[in-house]
Amino acid sequence: MTRSHNHSATLTTPDFDQARAEAAVRELLIAVGEDPDREGLLDTPARVARSYREIFAGLYTDPDEVLTTMFDEQHDEMVLVKDIPMYSTCEHHLVSFHGVAHVGYIPGVDGRVTGLSKLARVVDLYAKRPQVQERLTSQIADALMRKLDPRGAIVVIEAEHLCMAMRGIRKPGAVTTTSAVRGQFKTDKASRAEALDLILRK
């Protein structure tokens, strides 16, 4: 099987190795001084492996495939979906970062739009893999530009990182905000300001 080192790519085929993941979790329990054979931990390796398969499910689906459905609505104004719940995993510590994503675009000259649920699905697929927030934000925006051919795209993610909250600097409640702007949102200050006003308005 071929793997790509391009972070925007996906694996060619699903290849989650349940047995190997279980063995790794068992070894980790031993490494921290636990007894993986005690009652409370007997099924933990299998449970953790199954949860990782779900948490990293985005590795096995190409997000571009989600954006193939288009509708001819002759719409030429911004489409924005706010407050999409988002859960991802910090690739540096393999703990969660979670928050909300705001995703918007201005349809291209053909006025075609995609389904609103597709925007949320793209967020999920890029989030469900080892990530950093900056790359996640850019990947979503780039996917919109690549597949929808819009005049512009904007993505803002606000998230709390448990690697900052529960370890290290230990600052629970700190929120990291990242943005990616493309096309008209990057070149036209008025369009960008309108989008950010809508995103920040509660």
From Swiss-Prot:
Gene assigned in the entry: folE
GO cellular component, one term: cytoplasm
Catalytic activity field: GTP + H2O = 7,8-dihydroneopterin 3'-triphosphate + formate + H(+)
Keyword tags: GTP-binding, Hydrolase, Metal-binding, Nucleotide-binding, One-carbon metabolism, Zinc
Pathway: Cofactor biosynthesis; 7,8-dihydroneopterin triphosphate biosynthesis; 7,8-dihydroneopterin triphosphate from GTP: step 1/1
UniProt-listed Enzyme Commission number(s): 3.5.4.16
A Pfam family matched in the record: GTP_cyclohydroI
Name of the protein: GTP cyclohydrolase 1
Top-tier EC class: hydrolase
Transmembrane segments annotated in the record for this chain: none
Positions bound to Zn(2+): 90, 93, 163
SUPFAM superfamilies named among the record's database cross-references: Tetrahydrobiopterin biosynthesis enzymes-like
GO molecular function per UniProt: GTP binding; GTP cyclohydrolase I activity; zinc ion binding
Organism: Mycolicibacterium gilvum (strain PYR-GCK)
NCBIfam families: folE, PRK09347.1-2, PRK09347.1-3
